Swiss-Prot record:
Induction: Up-regulated in response to endoplasmic reticulum stress (at protein level).
Gene name of the record: OS9
Protein name per its UniProtKB record: Protein OS-9
Matching SUPFAM superfamilies: Mannose 6-phosphate receptor domain
PTM comment: Intramolecular disulfide bonds.
Tissue: Ubiquitously expressed. Found as well in all tumor cell lines analyzed, amplified in sarcomas. Highly expressed in osteosarcoma SJSA-1 and rhabdomyosarcoma Rh30 cell lines.
InterPro entries per UniProt: Man6P_isomerase_rcpt-bd_dom_sf (IPR009011), MRH_dom (IPR044865), OS-9-like (IPR045149), OS9-like_dom (IPR012913)
Acidic residues biased stretches: 413-429
Organism in which the protein naturally occurs: Homo sapiens
Function: Lectin component of the HRD1 complex, which functions in endoplasmic reticulum (ER) quality control and ER-associated degradation (ERAD). Specifically recognizes and binds improperly folded glycoproteins as well as hyperglycosylated proteins, retain them in the ER, and transfers them to the ubiquitination machinery and promote their degradation. Possible targets include TRPV4 as well as hyperglycosylated HSP90B1.
Biased composition (Basic and acidic residues): 302-311, 396-412, 430-452, 504-513, 633-647
GO molecular function, one term: carbohydrate binding
Amino acid sequence: MAAETLLSSLLGLLLLGLLLPASLTGGVGSLNLEELSEMRYGIEILPLPVMGGQSQSSDVVIVSSKYKQRYECRLPAGAIHFQREREEETPAYQGPGIPELLSPMRDAPCLLKTKDWWTYEFCYGRHIQQYHMEDSEIKGEVLYLGYYQSAFDWDDETAKASKQHRLKRYHSQTYGNGSKCDLNGRPREAEVRFLCDEGAGISGDYIDRVDEPLSCSYVLTIRTPRLCPHPLLRPPPSAAPQAILCHPSLQPEEYMAYVQRQADSKQYGDKIIEELQDLGPQVWSETKSGVAPQKMAGASPTKDDSKDSDFWKMLNEPEDQAPGGEEVPAEEQDPSPEAADSASGAPNDFQNNVQVKVIRSPADLIRFIEELKGGTKKGKPNIGQEQPVDDAAEVPQREPEKERGDPERQREMEEEEDEDEDEDEDEDERQLLGEFEKELEGILLPSDRDRLRSEVKAGMERELENIIQETEKELDPDGLKKESERDRAMLALTSTLNKLIKRLEEKQSPELVKKHKKKRVVPKKPPPSPQPTEEDPEHRVRVRVTKLRLGGPNQDLTVLEMKRENPQLKQIEGLVKELLEREGLTAAGKIEIKIVRPWAEGTEEGARWLTDEDTRNLKEIFFNILVPGAEEAQKERQRQKELESNYRRVWGSPGGEGTGDLDEFDF
């Protein structure tokens, strides 16, 4: 094939380059088998051309492809200096010989390996047996593959000449005169090869494989850490392939035309960048001066500003109520510009700040919310005193009646109003959180949205704790109220907090968002989604993400499971499904991936489930679990694709460049 032919010619030129300087100086050249055994070469055809005939270096060779495209290939420096580096190795080995290193295996237990029907038993220095096992018992005849005869002698000068054992780095023993073979009538025989395995541990001898290259002639490969101290059997350090870099070689006029085209494209790109930079200050100046675009989705600027102000006001004042203790439904508000102006007349300064505030990141949005909360708290009294003031201002006709009535009548009226408020309490909470979710939907990424939810949740908890403390003071200023009344009030506030937190954690369904746009009223319960079935192809891949945190010596293990509505979980499921479909893989059963890292400071709710680095590496982790080494194979396929594309390219005059025939080309 074309690539093999090109690589073979390059290797031939490489050997010629190694031999030629020695022959010119009167030396004797030789083919270095050790170099071919221990060095690996890889060819890289680069897309960047060079001007031909400019390099006079001795390590550059000229080759031509099947499409008549010429290349200048530079040999790696490791190939030139390989022999000199080998001569500068460590001094001769002074430790025990190979037979002495293996002698402890004589007293060790025999090694066993089961392959298909047969079980093989190797006893060092004695024999090799083959038999069938059932229920830990030998069934049938026991065959002898051979008895110990001899071992390879590393001190024999004749044996050294073969170089076979040294190149492949193994020690061998010969076993013969075994049971008679039914196929050829000769006794069975076997060769046992011992290789170093540094990862096997102490006494980690094992039979790696059993082969039968010829009838009744066997080869057993045994890996052991006992041979690793010997330099002749220690595996060489793994090294990346030595790259042979090949650049397309162009004629001077072709190369100058290529350089001119590159310069023109660079000038065009620089011109576009300059135009964008010139437009940048104009855009930002319009934003800072408060100039809004004319097209605002069919709505007037006053109306949009009113909506923004209402939304932020709802976020910062969730306890504000309308006259009579009832909240004004969203659909009953006057949507006209005049009504919007009158409704937002008080916080005009706040509204102007919103117009000129530039939100560049989720962190800016969070800081902005905190500023709004702080400013609102400074400009109004505490929550415990706010409601009576509003009632006094909005319902002046009821105040005389309350003053004239007795305290019991007043308490009854307040209880009736509280009951009316409770009916719309859940609906108002869902409406508030729904508006908040809808505003953030187009601003934040899924990961940033989760972090913002957790921070808003923590802020709500702090606010409601203050409410509970103030309520306790109002209910029992002198310590005379009953304990049951105080507990009942705290229970009601805690229930409200739990509802808000639960709604904050849940993600609204698309049907719920459409309801918001039409009526701006959220139903009490979203319709339950149909349970996925195993036959549904969309739900054949299910991912569960669980976070475990080990506490102190007196604390239990904290277990948190990611909700199905979390967008990050949907992203992970899509990633796994795409990977399985593309590679044609099946994950039978369950696959468990553990990511261990130091626990970040903060609460469990505030900490992120997966970091950005974990999400990026999850694909590679999952790929390597299903198919060990498959990720490297995918990278190699991509490299091979680029290599073929560069090899097919035929350089020529401007506009005359083309590619080779895709059908006849094959790597």
